[in-house]
Swiss-Prot record:
NCBIfam families: aden_deam (TIGR01430), PRK09358.1-6 (NF006850). It comes from Azotobacter vinelandii (strain DJ / ATCC BAA-1303). The record marks 218 as: Important for catalytic activity. This is Adenine deaminase. Catalyzes the hydrolytic deamination of adenine to hypoxanthine. Plays an important role in the purine salvage pathway and in nitrogen catabolism. GO terms for cellular component: cytosol. Zn(2+) binds at residues 14, 16, 194, 275. InterPro entries: A_deaminase_dom, ADE, Ado/ade_deaminase, Metal_Hydrolase. Its cofactor is Zn(2+).
Amino acid sequence: MYAWLNALPKAELHLHLEGSLEPELLFALAERNKVALPWPDVESLRKAYAFNNLQEFLDLYYQGANVLRTEQDFYDLTWAYLRKCKEQNVVHTEPFFDPQTHTDRGIPFETVLSGIGQALEDGRKRLGIGSGLILSFLRHLSEEEAHKTLDQALPFRHAFIAVGLDSSEKGHPPRKFRQVFERARAEGFATVAHAGEEGPPEYIWEALDLLKVKRIDHGVRAAEDPRLLERLIDEQIPLTVCPLSNVKLRVFKDMSEHNILKLLEMGVKVTVNSDDPAYFGGYVTENFVALQESLGMTCEQAERLAQNSLDARLA
């Protein structure tokens, strides 16, 4: 079944580039940039990946991102991910990157963007992988900080297809970023947002009504609100679901409890994605395999999920 699922043409619509930083590359970049790490070797770092919730993961994620310093680093990070896409027949990807994670460390915005952008361009030319980059605001920071990031991005507007919202969800509702999203839309960007992962269904309503998003990232807690489900089905608003991530971060205790196939059968436009694959134990194919092994996903369901991802592209 792995080979068949791997060969299925699919798009990935929920992937954080910084979250695809594998331990081996992290160590190589640390050595290249002479960055001291708190782990003595790759194995120790892998063991540190046994976190229990979103905040513990984010603490590790931001520590790992600290090794990314130069344009070449960002190129190497993105290229490693694109090679994995090629291996798994991901024909199109719309990755997120978090400029604030890097600009707050003194890395120039254009350094980050140049490295990522060049790799995506090479991915199109050399690997045949379509792509569109999404600039994501960090929700644990202020809306004022998000406005500054948008200011930095505007001279490079051609490089992005959308703006998004990620990081710690609890206590940071979408309404906090209403004005910056309004401004981004006025500048011609599509909008997406993480909502309904650890946060309540109300956050999904806010993302739809206040941020006017085209897609909801995660969104699994929509199942708690029948009226919201009805709207998602009626308007065919895609959810970019990340099964392995959800289990690793305890959104579901076990993959056997995941609701993605129930949502699919209800008519919700759900898609399968890897989120932060270096940290969550698998890329897109591994997420499909987990659904097949734990939920008995059929070939027909897998084909529908893959087609949903291709249909839900912004670029």
